[in-house]
UniProtKB/Swiss-Prot annotation:
Keywords annotated in UniProt: Disulfide bond, Ion channel impairing toxin, Knottin, Secreted, Signal, Toxin
Name of the protein in question: U11-theraphotoxin-Hhn1a
Role this protein plays: Probable ion channel inhibitor.
Record text about domains: The presence of a 'disulfide through disulfide knot' structurally defines this protein as a knottin.
Length: 113
């Protein structure tokens, strides 16, 4: 019976001491993995940041193109009176003094070029 107790005690002591060593090794491995994981996360974060900056630059570029009056504002059609000093005739039209009809109105009209 004593030999069983001694054997059990010996196995218990060995298990505890080896378990402590394994625990320390596991802790070291976990620290290494977390450091590698952090470096991977930093890399992924930088990559995502670059992509977001590129996307933001494209969006700002599109906004600036729209703000440069790329679209034509409301314009005056053909045969409609216009202001000589501030003509707003549509593209392809010119603000001219009428030749025949409308002479009595003393106004300018949008005509084709």
């Amino acid at each position: 019976m004593n030999t069983v107790r001694v054997t059990f005690l010996l196995v218990f002591v060995l298990a505890v001491s080896l378990g402590q060593a394994d625990k320390d090794e596991n802790r070291m491995e976990m620290q290494e993995k977390t450091e590698q994981g952090r470096s991977y996360l930093d890399f992924a974060e930088n990559l995502l940041l670059q992509k977001l900056e590129e996307l933001e630059a494209k969006l700002l570029e599109e906004d600036s193109e729209e703000s440069r009056n790329s679209r034509q504002k409301r314009c005056i059609g053909e045969g409609v009176p216009c202001d000589e000093n501030d003509p707003r005739c549509c593209s392809g039209l010119v603000c001219l003094k009428p030749t025949l009809h409308g002479i009595w109105y003393k106004s300018y009209y949008c005509y084709k070029k």
